[in-house]
Amino acid sequence: MRPPRRKGAGRSGALGDILHEPSVRQKVTAMPQTDQNRAREPRQRSHASAFAPDLAVKVEAAASPLSSPSGTPRQVAAEPRTAKHLQAGKPDEPRRATAGAGPGRAEASPPQLDAEAFAANLTRLAEETARASKAYLKPQLAGESSPWVNAEVGEIARTLGEVAERWMAEPQRALEAQTRLTSGLIGLWADALRRFEGEEVPPARPPDPADRRFKDPAWKQNPFYDFLRQSYVHTAQWAEDMVREAKDMDPHTRHKAQFYVRQLAAALSPSNFVALNPELIRQTIEQNGANLVRGAQMLAEDVEAGGGELKIRQTDTRTFEVGVNLATTPGKVVLRNDLIELIQYAPTTEMVLRRPLLIVPPWINKFYILDLNPEKSFIRWAVAQGLTVFVISWVNPDTRHADKGFDAYMREGIFAALHAIEEATGERKVSAVGYCVGGTLLSTTLAYMAAKGDRRIESATLLATQVDFKHAGDLQVFVDEKQVRAVEDEMRSHGFLDGKRMALAFNMLRPNDLIWRYMVDVYLKGKAPMAFDLLFWNSDSTRMPAVNHSFYLRNCYLENNLTKGRMVIDGVTLDLGRVTVPVYNLAAKEDHIAPALSTFEGSRHFGGEVRYVMAGSGHIAGVINPPTHQKYQYWTGGPVGDSFQGWVERAEEHKGSWWPDWFAWIERQASERVAARIPGGSKFMELEDAPGSYVKVKS
């Protein structure tokens, strides 16, 4: 009979705040020592044992021991199975034999490796690794591989090479820096030797409770692994210091170097290697390597699914389906053109605000981040407040859309939606919401409309939106003239930028949570990830049309033309100062994509009243924060002043969600209510039910 699975698996991470469950902590057990061992222990532990600590003594067991004193059951991985079989529990699970609790009962022996089973699993591991290698090499051999990876590696080498050059120009400072590194490591090793002797030594670098990589108690309780952890932290901090202290570096190069050092530090963590991670060693022994076989199976499947590139498995994608258990707010598609489907949502109140609401989501992701499920849906909540909600669903572009630029997204996106809303409701004036790059497009459109005297948008809400890119955060590391040209060259061959590129860029902003966590849990522990709607959305990437994306990179990130009055759309030079409609500008305190400072600076370029609000958490969780969850907080501080720091100091904190504050602001703009409207009205054919077809197209 198969024993039950262990509990304690951490919840999947997200693009916003990552929630972790605490590791299971159990008492450390050790093998009994003989008198002979005890007699010679002190001298040996200061030499050989210190370098090769006995796992049975010094590695804490995270779960019940694998075997009883009578022996260890053999485990050999089954024939190749799909991820579906893996998650269903069909592969062999380790049998956990534990000692009874009665008097005179011996304590369970530590995990023992079954050599025959381990050898069989190593054979299977080699087969699955070869399968993954074959999938990786297939596009390389066919001449279809993207040059992006090699270009990025070259950029990393060039950037870090500049740091090295600065230090080589100052040999004395370089020697002092090297001395700091080596003396720190020697001190840590001396502390480890004292701990091996049984002395209590406080760690020079205490564990960070928020760092889940080192949650296993062995990282703290075992002197060898504690030395390994502290040495890693010490070296990583030293590398960051080297970048920060390098002289005569321009800010952009230093920023890139800091970013790349963080990537390398995340990749080289000892927790990422089977031979250095006590939890992985323990699980591999307990399962005779079957965990590695399962992980290699999933690795091969994910490289195949990525067309030769690893598409990291962050969640169980089979659990979700757009339109079934995601994006389920009732509504109708009332307009479709080459770029958008416009969705009008069905009312749930008898009376609604006269002024309709148009939501312009980002096209870098899909709109259903605003409609994940009934409990998290901003769209459903807005409908429940009595708003007639229209949402643009952008096409997932292909080669046919290569020449669609920012101007096309304005005309065929926002302007087409405004015309359809007027036809469907009879209302010419609307309130508009823009999220992320959707907010940048909305701001651009407002400046264009101001130049043309068009006042159809009476108020604007910007969610985590940048219009001033001077402080644009870590995404700036991917944008300089050389890198933009490389992206343009890549897009030229297909007419679009593959969604995998943007997905990887976003994952690199949080490498420990969104890359290496899954490399370890999925591909080394062999655990199929949990179902998590937010991570499903995160992996449901979209492509970007070549002309549009080039315009965005150059005019926003590279040249910051919108706030400098140099952006031109359809021959019109744009000036945000001419935008006088009320603006509700929401930032997120921990946003790593549109930093709060960046969005604050953008507020000062508009010509009308701006209500700047800062939500707790990050780019996603700060925005998608329903009032019923009673999570986080938001700050209001009145008009935008001279400095962001000054605004923060005088801001007033409010518990919970910003959504009610926003709706009160919307209602103050135009509070008149009318009878609820049926989607499409009398002038539109209902093309299909929400969420439509465009959102279901995969990259």
Question: What is each model feature region?
Answer:
Residues 248-283, 423, 427, 445-549, ...:
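Alpha/beta-hydrolase-fold enzymes
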Residues 371-388:
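Short amphipathic alpha-helix adjacent to the substrate-entry channel of hydrolases
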Residues 425-437:
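Alpha/beta-hydrolase fold nucleophile elbow
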